[in-house]
Amino acid sequence: MKKLILAAAVSTALLGGAAQAAITVDGNGIPVINAATTYEIFLSGSSAAGPFIDSLLTSSKVPVANRICDSAQLIYKYSDTATGGKDQKAYLCALNTANPALKGLAGNKTNLLVYKRDNGGSAQGVSPVIADTAIDFLKVDTAANCAKVSDGVAGTSFTKINCDYTSGNVALSNPQKPDFGISDVDPVQFQGDNTPSGFAPVTAADLSQLTVKAAASQIFGIAVSTKLRNAMQEATFGASNVCVGSEKPECMPSLGSAQIASIFTGKLNSWKQLKVATGDLFTNASAKNKPVSDRLHICRRTSGSGTGAQLGIKFMGYPCNDVATQGAVDTGALPETVAKAQIHAMSSSGAMSECLSELNSGTDTVGTSFSNTFLTGARWAIGIQGTEQNAGLTSDWRFIKIDGIEPTLDKVARGKYKDWVELTYQYNNAHAFDTSEKAIVDEFIKESGNPLVMAATNLAAVHTWGQAGFLATPQSNSATISGLVDYAKPVNPFSHGTTDAATNNCRIPAIYNPGTTGGIQFK
């Protein structure tokens, strides 16, 4: 059996279509995976795109002809038990034959099983794809390994199943070669500190083995623990101002690019080093928002993360130029009394969220991705996340502005907001696909870059401060003549690629191809 993986931000919107043969379940409600009726595809890489993939697979807003799964039938979502799917997940659905590209495939199978590995981030969608080597995915075809958590509703929610997972244990993992990968930035960026453990830096020779396709502009943002956000509001607007604790865009505090670089390169070790007039941020904070220590905590991503790679590109020039300073590295068990920033390296976006939230509350959830040892009270922490995260404000962290600009589709399309990159899909040209898998992968990539699909997936990224998420790239789609974002068909007028050169996120973005009448907004 082979592997089917949906791009971390692409899977969800692709569901829907004509009814097909029902998926068979056992007495415990666990699907029985039948190789004769199920295409299997394995996708590894970007964890930041995870919510996008969920939406791609479930949204009924996506036109029927563009869906991958049949949303008229129940969809099953598998998650690794320990992290609740932050590291590993898989989706089982009826294949949507109302999509012309998926009708009449060889093998005549009715169902689709897509495995998605988030653990290790974007580089796991690059380095193993180049090497065409097996990495661990979730094992879902052993009923004793899995338990149903909740029942879903067709077209609305998944039936959720948890499966025990242990990397390196073939009884509790599924080693497979990724059919394709997804990365927040283009593959060449995975060198130096961006190289994942166990793999070599990406070279020009490596790139020649791949087909790489830019699919979407993905917006990132600086995330801070909620009490830190509130303290920043106190320092910005005054402790008694109505903006303190508010989620409105006019109440979002801001950090400048140079301040962000100073923090993430480890130049600051205490929140007292962020000055407020003749005082400082820590001393200025009210008792309810002040942490028990002024030590600066950073939730960063592990080497190989695309989220971390884009942070380096946008704020430190790393690895784009030889004199760039790379981000500060994990400090491990360093005592908090040492005058050095505490750096916590997280393997996925879900783990990043946990790091920020648990430091904010001074608590720890045993057995999950982040082991918080700072349990005497709250700490202020800062991190980086894709803007499709936490739109429902369910985690104890918040986005802030960068250089005074909020991270919205509108501000990106106007050329005002800087922290966005173009994510790519890639597959190895020599990879051996099972029957019809290549056609499914091609359609998955195509629909991931479809602005009509993005309009549907972006509904999960509506924040109190504006619409965030993804925009289609201008290489395959036309931006509006005015340069304003069309939320029903969002296309970025800017690109890190040119009409003569492929996407490279180290390139300063510019308008792609305005023709004789197109343009960009002045304000």
List the predicted regions and their residue ranges:
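Gram-negative bacterial Sec-dependent N-terminal signal peptides
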Residues: 1-21
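Flexible loop/hinge segments at secondary-structure junctions
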Residues: 22-523
